[in-house]
Amino acid sequence: MRTRSQVWAQKAYEKVREAAKGEGRGEYRDMALKLPVLVRQAGLSQALAFVDSRGKEAHKALGNDLAQVLGYRDLRELAEAAREAELLQYLRLTREVLAAAEWFKRFAQALIEE
């Protein structure tokens, strides 16, 4: 039996490995490095809205990848869940997003060159 963090790590690794092969990998890496800090500073809903509004496919790809790792269809569904969540659910979702985002950050540092 694996922990939730282990499952997220495996899925994040696969997503980042795929992103490392594609166009926009530098932008994907940059956003992966910034996302945990952005969530801590601006809050979950604002951070997700920022990623969605950037207009760059690599940023949206990261948002969608993060959402899928956490069991959501895409970034917009994750953002909707954050907007509609009660306080305790919102705090839990924030912790989950931060935990998964840290895996994306680490794997982006390791797999995507600057």
From Swiss-Prot:
It comes from the Bacteria. GO terms for biological process: defense response to virus. It is found in: Cytoplasm. One of its GO terms (cellular component) is cytoplasm. Keywords: Antiviral defense, Cytoplasm, Plasmid. The keyword Cytoplasm applies. Homotrimer. This is CRISPR system Cmr subunit Cmr5. The gene is cmr5.
